[in-house]
Amino acid sequence: MSGPDAQTKMQFLFALRSRGVTEAAVLEAMEAVDRGLFLRGIFSERAYEDVPLPIACGQTISQPSVVGLMTQALQVNPRDTVLEVGTGSGYQAAILAKLARRVYTVDRHGRLVREARQVFQQMSLSNITSLVGDGSHGMPDQAPFDRIIVTAAAEDPPGPLLAQLKVGGIMVVPVGQSDAVQTLIRVRKTENGLEYDELRPVRFVPLLEGLGKDT
């Protein structure tokens, strides 16, 4: 599939700005990553609509404005090491890879990880490490992380992930019941404890333990 034309890209960036994605580095990263590469079949034609779309394993690719707002809230620096819990399509990880030194991404569905890895290779993104695993426990062998982003909803910010966050680090996670509107939370880890900011209402699939049946 060819990438978006100039008009489509301009409309896409305008829509992101109008929904609060205003940081230049985030917009540049999202402009550089073709969302269509992460979608299959008829859904690739809707890649530049600001809507969530279905992918394999009963999962979804989040709407671009939510991806942008979560990325913006994470405040990624060029030297950061980032953990993403929930690879999904790989779209979020690819954007993070444009901003961070190293991205580790984990998903419980082997098929999703394999398909995302193919796109990362196609895009020559050599700073992403993708693994199949139970993301609710993080990646302790690679910890600690400067930034952690969770793309599934937990009832509370997961303790194992907070333990893997560096002092001075930031975690962005949807918090709430899986069958209701959740709240996007930003957690800052300081020497004195944890600071929480409520950002906006969101809807995400639940964060589940264990591996997917397809793995």
Curated annotation (Swiss-Prot):
User: Which species is the source of this protein?
Assistant: Ruegeria sp. (strain TM1040)
Catalytic residues as annotated in Swiss-Prot or TrEMBL: S62
What EC number(s) is this enzyme filed under?
Answer: 2.1.1.77
Q: What does this protein do?
A: Catalyzes the methyl esterification of L-isoaspartyl residues in peptides and proteins that result from spontaneous decomposition of normal L-aspartyl and L-asparaginyl residues. It plays a role in the repair and/or degradation of damaged proteins.
One of the protein's GO biological processes:
protein repair
Task: Cite a single GO MF annotation.
Answer: protein-L-isoaspartate (D-aspartate) O-methyltransferase activity
A single GO CC term for this protein reads:
cytoplasm
Task: State the family it belongs to.
Answer: Belongs to the methyltransferase superfamily. L-isoaspartyl/D-aspartyl protein methyltransferase family.
Principal localization reads cytoplasm
Q: What is this protein called?
A: Protein-L-isoaspartate O-methyltransferase
Question: Is Methyltransferase among the key words of this record?
Answer: yes
Q: What class of enzyme is it?
A: transferase
Q: Which subcellular locations apply to this protein?
A: Cytoplasm
An example Pfam family from this entry, by short name, is PCMT
Record-linked InterPro entries: PCMT, SAM-dependent_MTases_sf
Report the gene name.
pcm
| Chemical reaction(s) catalysed | [protein]-L-isoaspartate + S-adenosyl-L-methionine = [protein]-L-isoaspartate alpha-methyl ester + S-adenosyl-L-homocysteine
Instruction: Provide the alphabetized UniProt keywords.
Output: Cytoplasm, Methyltransferase, S-adenosyl-L-methionine, Transferase
